[in-house]
């Protein structure tokens, strides 16, 4: 499985290619050719965990966010997240993007 952190992603981004992918994502959105269920959210003790899954014929991914407001007092971000990408045919984990 591929693990990419912020620096890895920044080094590998092709802005022209990224714009092409964003345009493709808008086409998929406009056509309705995706499945994105309501976001499961877990809230406890002023902390929040949110899952944002989405599935198309060519991709399967889940964005996970945590919201911990008290982290500010620790010098940490109050919102953290990552994306898990899976093979859309087998479900096998392919990559984690931090």
Give residue ranges: language-model regions:
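N-terminal ligand-binding/catalytic initiation module
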Residues: 1-97
């Amino acid at each position: 499985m591929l693990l990419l952190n912020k620096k890895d992603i920044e080094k590998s981004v092709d802005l022209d290619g990224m714009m092409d992918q964003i345009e493709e994502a808008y086409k998929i959105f406009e056509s309705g050719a995706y499945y994105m269920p309501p976001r499961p959210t877990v809230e406890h003790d002023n902390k929040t965990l949110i899952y944002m899954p989405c599935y198309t014929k060519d991709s399967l991914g889940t964005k996970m966010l945590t919201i911990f407001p008290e982290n500010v007092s620790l010098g940490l971000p109050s919102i953290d997240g990552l994306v898990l990408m899976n093979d859309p045919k087998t479900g096998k984990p392919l990559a984690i993007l931090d």
